[in-house]
Amino acid sequence: MEKKMTNWGSRFLRNAALVLVGCGLVGAQLCAQEQKAAAPKSSSAAAKNALAGAMSTPAATAVHGQELTATDLSAFLDGLIPQQIEKADIAGAVVAVVKDGKVLFEKGYGYSDAEKKTPVSPQDTLFRPGSISKTFTWTAVMQQVEQGKLNLDADVNQYLDFKVPQTFGKPTTLRDIMTHRSGLEETIKDLFVGEEKELTPISKYLPSHLPKQIFAPGTIPAYSNYATTVAAYAVQRVSGQDFNDYLDEHFFKPLNMTRATFRQPLPESLKPFMSNGYDLGSGKPKHFEWVEVAPAGSLSASAESMAHWMIMHLQNGRYGEAQILKPETAIQMHARQDGWPASMNAMCLGFYEQNLNGHRVISHGGDTELFHSDLFLILDSNVGLFVSYNSAGRPDHGDARGDLYIRFMDRYFPAPAANEPATATAKEDAQSVAGPYKISRRFETNILAVTTVLDEAKIVADPKDNTIYLDGLFKKENGQPRHFLEIAPMLFKSVDGPEKVAFVKDGNGRRVCYLDFPFMVLQEVDVALDKQAFNYVVMGLGIGVVVLTILFWPVSAILRKHYKQSLMLDPAARKWRRWAKIACIIDLIYLLGFLWAFTLLQKLELGSGGDFKLHLLQVIGVLGGVGGLLTIICAMKSWTDSTQWVWYKVWNTLLAVGCVGFFWFLVHWHLLNFSLNY
């Protein structure tokens, strides 16, 4: 549910049918595969170490910004957000800023119901903050750690009534899950469902939708909604409370979050306050989004309630008289975790760093299909910022949340202009890191694995200025790629922005690219059969010859009839030719069926109810593969028949190669995988 990935990431999520995602490197020398989670410690020792680390963080360089006051915030945000929502065609937005334990500013902009012109109220209007919901799940985990009912470094399976796989011979821990290093494959089936009656308890959802483990736990970050839900289920089991009841008792009531709930449908008392969600503010409202993995993204909350949540975390677990976490537990939760390059943002326990202008900032973004939100905690200044938009908006108008955050930081917490010259090896290193990459948060073994090759990321070296750019990932407002210059060995910084990327090599010598958002990485594609260019050639040839063969079939018949020519083939050759044509038709039916299924998957409209149709489609694909063998026989027989034209023989050969390549593509990318967990 996290989609903090700008244009390229949005394309990935769209093509993968994901509604995911809202969504620092010189000193580290260990490769990603060798980086382990911290060794088990007692909670008190871990908290002391985390506190020491937090206290020893160098202070930001003193640069005077605008004084952070309600008056100045009003002038600043009133000039920015209305402009954003107008240009991007967003119906409404809400923002809250807290400082030193108090709500400093909160305001709604635009409409919660555009047709009725109902204004957004920061106190009452409910927005859907998506994956910011996860911060509640993580905080619940830490409460149970305090009570000794959960251990961050124990095998999570001891808290479950089903088994998370140990594919690599190593157990998955809650620390792995909270840092998004569970190693589990991406999964989206039934992430959202179409109506309330399709919702199932997480106790049933989790064992029936168990993904494969594609990385060793504690190694490669790969964001996971599923793993988050596993953590919530562990809380539910050890606490003995339904997760919704747990949230009400331990968070919403003591924090006076009167306009907040994870429940679906909303309680009757809250339904009148729910904002509509829109694709475009000028369009019609969409239905309420039913989130199957509720602990990962079903929160509905007002900005004021989210302000209380931020205050609690900024005050290390305290809100008013309520102590949600012990101070040492909160500090431990907010502390940077091991395993990320020193000069890049890292995961905390649930939160992740979004450091800017010399200030340490922990954050969490969130996205449903319609609502897009972000939460930032500027720890060294005791300031929190929450913003949410109730529309997807026009895709060509950039990232409103990211723009607001950077402008906010530059205004109130600016940094001096950095003088970071290029390294002497900038040209050589830019060329060495260029090439195709794949995202770690991906489908690897299920029917959506094909999205990995469709959305291959490319890092390109620009010889004109010795920079690199990431195809589609970091773009300026004008749509042009943002260029990065090497400022330290294998650390590249945007030439006109704060973004950084860094490269290390894993245990197999493949490059891993760390990004500003630390919950996933890019991994070098070094296998030719997995590269996009090769697969496009295979698919292009296969689809091309199949479609042309089908088209030529009636055309050739019409021409023969017109010129009164007979088909110069013996009965056996005619039979094989007929079977080859049927194989082509089957392949075309499969291709059209796959495009249909993929369209529904993009809209998250093909959940468990579509299993039979997908199985039928896979059977058609297998029949197409059998038909491919028939095209080989047809081609072989044509070459042994001296009466057939040479061009006919060549075409039969191309058809056989194309059909076999098409079938290889289906098998290689698991499109014929009869497991329907995806």
Language model region names:
Residues 15-28:
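Bacterial N-terminal signal peptides
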Residues 28-34, 65:
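Boundary at the C-terminal end of the N-terminal hydrophobic targeting segment
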Residues 364, 374-391, 512-516:
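Short, well-ordered beta-strand elements
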Residues 65-127, 149-154, 158-159, 207-212, ...:
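Short, conserved catalytic-motif segment at the N-terminal edge
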Residues 152-167, 255:
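Short, glycine/proline-biased beta-turn/loop segments that scaffold the active-site neighborhood
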Residues 109-113, 166-379, 404:
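Short, surface-exposed loop or secondary-structure junction motifs
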Residues 2-17:
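Bacterial N-terminal signal peptides that target proteins for export
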Residues 398-678:
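Peripheral terminal and inter-domain segments
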